[in-house]
Structure formats: C-alpha cells, structure tokens
Amino acid sequence: MEIELSNNAVSWFKEELELPEGDKVLQFFVRYGGEFQLKQGFSPAFSVDKKEDVEIGYENHYDGLDVVIAEKDLWYFEDHNLFIDVNDGIDEISYATK
C-alpha cells in the first residue's frame, strides 16, 4: 500500500487547505459512495485533523505536508497504490491506481 501525491497535488493541498499548520495533518479516509472506488460502494476522502487525534496506521511526508491514514481505514487502502493528482480542468483532486 502506498499513497503518492504529485507535486501539483501537494501544492493544491497546501494552498487550498492552508497546510502545513502546526500539528495538523492531511488525513485520507474511507467514505460511503463516491465516484472513484477502490472497493465497491466506498471512495477515498480527505480532511485536516490534529495529528494527536488520529490513530495513525500509515504516514508519509511530502515537502512539509504530513499525510496519514487512520488504522481503522487501512482495510480500504490496503493492496492498492493510490496516486493523487489535480485535474487542472476543474481544479479538483483526482485519484488513480498504479
């Protein structure tokens, strides 16, 4: 399992979510529904949370941006390498598997 962010995605998260900020992390989690589905019926989502509030199961760092997945959400991301980029046409995050 790997989460990879493009340079454009790192810049987008930093600008749109005003990260990095103190002890805040970019957390990816699983939600019900959505377009891009690693497992049927569920899709990835993200939020900004305090690092101490997340029971971290996965962590990576991109140019000062801390990216985490909580232990409880690893089941969704396991067995996949997720690539996160920006769809420039609509200025939104896009997901793909590698």
Swiss-Prot record:
It comes from the Bacteria. Belongs to the HesB/IscA family. This is Uncharacterized protein SSP1406.
